[in-house]
C-alpha cells in the first residue's frame, strides 16, 4: 500500500513542470520545522476556539481534556462553561443514571457558584438523593441563578424531605438570586411563605413558575405571585388552587400578556376534593387581556367528579383526559370550548362518540389535533368528523380498535376516505403484538 502511495506521489512530481528551487540553508530548515511544530501544537489554539470545542463536550470528556495542558485547564474554568449545570443525584444500587461526583460538586460550589445561572437537580426516587439536592441548594449563597428546576425521575422524592429542610434550602436561592426568571418546583413541599420570599426578591424578573402538585401552597400564595410578578408569562398549578381572584390578577392592566396557563385537575380518590367552578367573567377577563394564551388542562378524574366543568364557555385550548370521560362531558366540550386546539381522550367506555365528535368538529373551529385510545366511534361518523375538520387536522392519532364498522365503511376503507379529506396518506395506529 505504501509503495502504491509513493509511486502516485512520484507521478505527480514527475508530471509537474520543473522549477529551479533555491538552495535552503540550515536556518531556513529550522524555521520550517519550528513552524510545523507550532501548527501541530494543540496547546496554542486560541482560547475562544478551545471554548467552542469544550461547549460541545460532555462534562467528563471536558474534565479529561482539561488535563492536556495548562492552557486547556484555564479554559476549563472559564465562567461561560459553568452558566448551565445539572446536578444528578441518585443511589447507585437503585438508579440507572450516573450521579455527579461529590468532589465535582464541591469544586463547583467553591469555584463556580458565582457563575451558575441555569441550574437543575435531577434526583431518583430515594429520599437521600432529594436531601442531598437540598444540601447543595443551601450552599448556593454566592450565585445569581436565573432558572431553577427540581426534577424527580420517578416518584416525587422531594415530598419525603422534611418540609423545614426543603423550604430553608429553597429560601437560600430565593434570597440570594435577585434575577430568577424561571422556576420549576413541581411535586415539592414549597409553601406560601416561601413564595412570598420569592416575590419579595424576584418580582421584577420572574417569567415562568411551574408548581403543580405542591400541597402546601394555597390560592393566597399564587395570588401573591400573580399580584406582584407583573412579568409572569407562564404558570402551572393545580385546579383546586385556581380562583377567580387569580385570573383577575393575571388580567390586570399592569400585567403582561399571559402566554401559557397549565392546570392539572387531579383526584386520587372519588370525592376527596370538591371541585369548584370558575366564573365565566373571570375567564372572559383573561382572554380579553391575553387573547393568545394557551390554556392547557390535564384531567385525572373519575366520571362522577366532572360536574363543575364545561357548563359555561371555557377558553381551554388543549385538553387531555387521562381517565375515562363521559359522553355528556364531551358533548359540553363541543358546545362550550370554541378555542379548543387539541383533544386527547384515553378512555370513554363502550358507547360510541359519534354525535359528540361531530359536534366538536362543527363548533371547535380551531381544532388541529385529536387522539383517541380506548373509545368507540363508528367508521361513518369518524369520516364525517374528518370531512368537517379537513386539512386543518395536522395530527390525528386513532387506535385501530376505536373504529367500529357500519353499513357505509369498514376500517380498511376508512383510511382511503380520511386520506382524501386530509390531503395526505393516513392510517389508524396499531397496537404492536410482542
From Swiss-Prot:
Q: A Pfam family for this UniProt protein?
A: F-box-like
Q: Where is the F-box domain?
A: 39-85
Tissue specificity = Expressed in the hypothalamus, especially in the suprachiasmatic nucleus (SCN). Expression is driven by the core-clock. There is a pronounced diurnal and circadian expression rhythms rising rapidly at the start of the day and declining at the onset of the night.
Q: Which InterPro entries does the protein's record reference?
A: F-box-like_dom_sf (IPR036047), F-box_dom (IPR001810), LRR_dom_sf (IPR032675)
Q: Which UniProt keywords apply?
A: Biological rhythms, Cytoplasm, Leucine-rich repeat, Nucleus, Repeat, Ubl conjugation pathway
Concerning SMART domains, the annotation shows: FBOX
Q: What does this protein do?
A: Substrate-recognition component of the SCF(FBXL21) E3 ubiquitin ligase complex involved in circadian rhythm function. Plays a key role in the maintenance of both the speed and the robustness of the circadian clock oscillation. The SCF(FBXL21) complex mainly acts in the cytosol and mediates ubiquitination of CRY proteins (CRY1 and CRY2), leading to CRY proteins stabilization. The SCF(FBXL21) complex counteracts the activity of the SCF(FBXL3) complex and protects CRY proteins from degradation.
Q: What is this protein called?
A: F-box/LRR-repeat protein 21
| Recorded name of the encoding gene | Fbxl21
Amino acid at each position: 500500500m505504501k509503495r502504491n502511495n509513493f509511486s502516485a506521489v512520484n507521478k505527480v512530481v514527475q508530471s509537474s513542470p520543473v522549477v529551479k528551487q533555491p538552495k535552503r540553508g540550515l536556518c531556513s530548515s529550522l524555521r520550517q520545522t519550528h513552524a510545523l511544530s507550532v501548527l501541530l501544537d494543540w496547546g496554542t489554539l486560541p482560547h475562544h476556539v478551545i471554548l467552542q470545542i469544550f461547549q460541545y463536550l460532555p462534562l467528563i470528556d471536558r474534565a479529561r481534556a482539561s488535563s492536556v495542558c495548562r492552557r486547556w485547564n484555564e479554559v476549563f474554568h472559564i465562567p461561560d462553561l459553568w452558566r448551565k449545570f445539572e446536578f444528578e443525584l441518585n443511589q447507585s444500587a437503585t438508579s440507572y443514571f450516573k450521579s455527579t461526583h461529590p468532589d465535582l460538586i464541591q469544586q463547583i460550589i467553591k469555584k463556580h457558584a458565582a457563575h451558575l445561572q441555569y441550574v437543575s437537580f435531577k434526583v431518583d426516587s430515594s429520599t437521600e438523593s432529594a436531601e442531598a439536592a437540598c444540601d447543595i441548594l443551601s450552599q448556593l449563597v454566592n450565585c445569581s441563578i436565573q432558572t431553577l428546576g427540581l426534577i424527580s425521575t420517578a416518584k416525587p422524592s422531594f415530598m419525603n424531605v422534611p418540609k423545614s429542610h426543603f423550604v430553608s434550602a429553597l429560601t437560600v436561592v430565593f434570597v440570594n438570586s435577585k434575577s430568577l426568571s424561571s422556576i420549576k418546583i413541581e411535586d415539592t413541599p414549597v409553601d406560601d411563605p416561601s413564595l412570598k420570599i420569592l416575590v419579595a426578591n424576584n418580582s421584577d424578573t420572574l417569567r415562568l413558575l411551574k408548581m403543580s402538585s405542591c400541597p402546601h401552597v394555597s390560592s393566597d400564595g399564587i395570588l401573591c405571585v400573580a399580584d406582584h410578578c407583573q412579568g409572569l408569562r407562564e404558570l402551572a398549578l393545580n385546579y383546586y388552587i385556581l380562583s377567580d381572584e387569580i385570573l383577575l390578577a393575571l388580567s390586570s392592566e399592569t400585567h403582561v400578556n399571559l402566554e401559557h396557563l397549565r392546570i392539572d385537575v387531579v383526584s386520587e380518590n372519588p370525592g376527596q376534593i370538591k371541585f369548584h367552578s370558575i366564573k365565566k367573567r373571570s375567564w372572559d377577563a383573561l382572554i380579553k387581556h391575553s387573547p393568545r394564551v394557551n390554556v392547557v388542562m390535564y384531567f385525572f378524574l373519575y366520571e362522577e367528579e366532572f360536574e363543575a366543568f364545561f357548563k359555561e364557555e371555557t377558553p381551554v385550548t388543549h385538553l387531555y383526559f387521562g381517565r375515562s370521560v363521559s359522553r355528556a362531558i364531551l358533548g359540553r366540550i363541543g358546545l362550550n370550548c370554541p378555542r379548543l386546539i387539541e383533544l386527547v381522550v384515553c378512555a370513554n367506555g363502550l358507547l360510541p362518540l359519534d354525535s359528540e365528535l361531530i359536534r366538536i368538529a362543527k363548533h371547535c373551529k380551531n381544532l388541529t389535533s385529536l387522539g383517541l385510545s380506548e373509545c368507540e366511534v363508528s367508521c361513518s361518523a369518524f369520516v364525517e368528523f374528518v370531512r368537517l375538520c379537513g386539512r386543518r387536522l395536522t395530527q390525528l392519532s386513532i387506535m385501530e380498535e376505536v373504529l367500529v364498522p357500519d353499513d357505509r365503511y369498514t376500517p380498511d376503507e376508512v383510511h382511503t376516505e380520511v386520506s382524501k379529506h386530509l390531503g395526505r396518506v393516513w392510517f389508524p395506529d396499531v397496537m404492536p403484538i410482542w
